[in-house]
């Protein structure tokens, strides 16, 4: 007996339907940045999500179907949206785009980073019962493609390790960031 496929769309966090999202989805944190990307870089963008103000669009970029959707702030927020995109909407690759803060005094505003690993002080990943601490790394080919594309376009890049935190303001240990940069 064949297992019946259940269409779990829309979800409580996404009004899109199966097929509304491309295989590749760009994810800035800010939903208004997603709107900007859609309106300025995609041909014929269609808004596919607006639940809770988290804007998502699908359109065409250089002949390729691409989606872009905000993720919100923090791992719990991107965790919800990314999980649903992968699990229910057929997205195969999410590329995080957007801004970030920095602890390294050599990094400047508007520097383009090619992230090679992402550490965290969050306990969000504990639910997966991985042994030890987990430092997420990108798909190697995607990272190389991003680097090569930036190089071809003359965009200087910096390889970087990043830290994602659950808190934006750390009043408890304001100097704690120094340990992450040593």
Where are these regions (language model features)?
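Active-site rim beta-loop-alpha module in soluble metabolic enzymes
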Residues: 137-182
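N-terminal short beta-loop-beta anion/metal-coordinating cradle
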Residues: 1-79
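Short acidic, glycine/serine/threonine-rich loops at helix termini
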Residues: 105-109, 125-126, 172-175
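Structural signature of FAD isoalloxazine-binding scaffolds in flavoprotein oxidoreductases
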Residues: 108, 112-116
């Amino acid at each position: 007996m064949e297992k019946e496929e259940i269409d779990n769309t829309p979800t409580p966090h996404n009004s899109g339907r199966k097929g509304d999202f491309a295989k590749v989805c760009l994810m800035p944190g800010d939903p208004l940045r997603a709107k900007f990307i859609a309106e300025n870089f995609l041909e014929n963008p269609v808004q596919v999500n607006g639940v809770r103000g988290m804007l998502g669009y699908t359109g065409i970029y250089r002949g390729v179907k691409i989606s872009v959707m905000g993720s919100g702030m923090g791992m719990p927020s991107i965790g919800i949206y990314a999980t649903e995109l992968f699990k229910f909407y057929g997205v195969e690759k999410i590329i995080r785009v957007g801004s970030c803060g920095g602890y390294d005094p050599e990094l400047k505003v508007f520097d383009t980073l090619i992230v090679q690993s992402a550490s965290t002080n969050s306990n969000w990943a504990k639910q997966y019962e991985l042994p030890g601490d987990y430092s997420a790394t990108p798909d190697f080919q995607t990272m190389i493609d991003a680097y090569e594309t930036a190089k071809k376009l003359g965009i200087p890049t910096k390889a970087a390790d990043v830290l994602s935190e659950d808190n934006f303001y750390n009043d408890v240990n304001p100097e704690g960031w120094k340990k992450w940069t040593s």
